[in-house]
Amino acid sequence: LILLAGFIFHTIFLCVQYAALGTAPVLDLKSAFSFFSWCIVLVFLVFHLKFRIMVLGSFVAPFAAFLMIISSAIPWAAGPVKPIFKSIWLTFHVTTIFLGNGLFAITFVAAIMYLIQERQIKQKHFGSFYSRLPSLATLDSINHYALIWGFPFLTLGMITGSIYAQVALGSYWQWDPKEVWSLVTWLFYAALLHERLTVGWRGRRAAVMSIVCFCILLFTFVGATLWVKGYHDFSSIGTSGA
């Protein structure tokens, strides 16, 4: 209930931000972390309706809260929003990309839970924590469903991002560091999806690969933005990309 209440207030806050900015509220790093957190909680709530696994929230909530703590520690970016950022293509781009990220965060959490549960079973530690975690089959199913839905969102986000780049910059592809790392991320998740659907990857192997893929995604989200300069740089809301 606390997580749901927080999600509702967060949703209202994001709607107010969208109305004030006239575009998706992710033009600075502070807002990006906030929106990422919101997407993760949204995806968890949807998955909770299907799987009815409350303990999943015990892993998701700290991660989402950590993102909000980072967001709150970053000062607001100053400056007006350039008209070029008030594009419906930009809104489509960031919304689909972040929803994909939220779904992949669920694959990451499910993978961590899978490895914890698997270790408890192998070591025959059947305590209270073991009984609270779902079965290995259920955790693998959560991982699978999140991947199945996350990959199309990531793909759609990259397509709409290319369209926005053409509208804003005159080219579908700029070889921006974040574009390159987004492609790397896409290729890794494509490989994971291929192995799951055609080779039949399940269990530990899929869990480990999900963790690897999400680490690459996090580097794309933060590292490729902060450490390598490009037009996706979050340096200022009035002068940077999204």
Regions found by a protein language model. Give the residues of each.
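Cytosolic, membrane-interface loops and tails of multi-pass inner-membrane proteins
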Residues: 123-137
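Active-site-proximal inter-transmembrane loops
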Residues: 81-89
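Hydrophobic cores of alpha-helical transmembrane segments in multi-pass integral membrane proteins
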Residues: 1-80, 92-121, 136-168, 174-241
